[in-house]
Every structure is written in structure tokens, then in C-alpha cells.
Amino acid sequence: MPRVKRGVQARARHKKVLKQAKGYYGARSRVYRVAFQAVTKAGQYAYRDRRAKKRQFRQLWIARINAASRQNGLSYSRFINGLKKASIEIDRKILADIAVFDKAAFAVLVEKAKAAL
């Protein structure tokens, strides 16, 4: 059985990790062992934060809707309840956009929610 030297594969693997660690500070971008740890941890953070981002945006939308609905004399929970009773199905992302960019249309929605309560 011939001898197998795995230098080529090791070099390729190291290059791949060091390429991913490009831009990191100090040894994290130069030393394979440290770079591998940094890249692995970065991947864990990225995985976690892709999920956290969804929660954070929903919080932001709710805060914006709450602020806008309170300016029109209705709390967030009563506003959402009123929309459900009026069978108006608009998701929070779109409601937040309307609240920020089209205050008149949002005021109409608030009035419809008030009427349905």
C-alpha cells in the first residue's frame, strides 16, 4: 500500500479558514489555530443572531405601532384587537411602515379599529 502524504489537503483546509478570517485582528487572521477558533465562534454568533434578528425587528415594529397608535388615542393592544375585530389583516411590518411613512392612512386604520371595539 503506498504512503499517503496529506499536505495538500491540510494546506487547502488552512487556506480556506485563513481566507474566512481575513480582516480579523492580529493572530486571529494569521495563525491557523487561533483563526479556526475565531471563525468557528463567528459562525455560532451568526447562526444565533440570524434568529435574534427576527425577534428584534418584531420588537421594533411593535414599538413603532404602539407610539403611532398612542398618538391617535389608542394603546397598541387595543389597536391590534380592534383590527382583528374589524377583520383587517395587515402584518406588523406593514403597519409599522404605514405608521412611519403615511400617518393619514394610519389614522384611518386607528379609527376603524376604534369603531370595531
Curated annotation (Swiss-Prot):
Where does this protein have coiled-coil stretches? none
What are the record's GO terms for cellular component? Answer: ribonucleoprotein complex; ribosome
Q: Name one GO biological process term.
A: ribosomal large subunit assembly
Q: Name one GO molecular function term.
A: rRNA binding
Domain of life, source organism: Bacteria
Q: Which Pfam families match?
A: Ribosomal_L20
Keyword annotations from UniProtKB, A to Z: Ribonucleoprotein, Ribosomal protein, RNA-binding, rRNA-binding
Please give the InterPro entries that the UniProt record associates with this protein. Ribosomal_bL20, RIBOSOMAL_L20_CS, Ribosomal_protein_bL20_C
Q: Which PROSITE patterns match?
A: RIBOSOMAL_L20 (PS00937)
Job description of the protein? Binds directly to 23S ribosomal RNA and is necessary for the in vitro assembly process of the 50S ribosomal subunit. It is not involved in the protein synthesizing functions of that subunit.
Q: Which PANTHER family match?
A: 39S RIBOSOMAL PROTEIN L20
What family is this protein classified in?
Answer: Belongs to the bacterial ribosomal protein bL20 family.
Q: What is this protein called?
A: Large ribosomal subunit protein bL20
